[in-house]
Amino acid sequence: MIHFICALKCEASPLIEHYQLKHIQKAVLFNIYMNNENGVSLTITGVGKLAAAMATTYTYTFLQCEADDVWINMGVAGHATHNIGDIYIANRIEDVSNTSTWY
């Protein structure tokens, strides 16, 4: 299964529409959308690292995910010199709050 994690509804809406995801009413802590036929879920987390971590953990437990499921954290960001509409895939992520780096 593929699980998308998005902070905001405006980031999630195109994916919800494209994958024809339906809101799971029983998921009360976070908004989770799912389509069992195509094996896709999406969780709206709210902004911030802690919210993303809690929502991802909640989704993993609530949906009883498998170890080989795919997780994609997707969102939008702004930048002073990059053009609107440019797409980037992060291959290095730095957390300046604790100097961690992930590849």
Q: Can you describe what each PLM-predicted range is?
A:
Residues 1-103:
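Metabolite-binding pocket within alpha/beta catalytic cores that recognizes anionic/polar moieties
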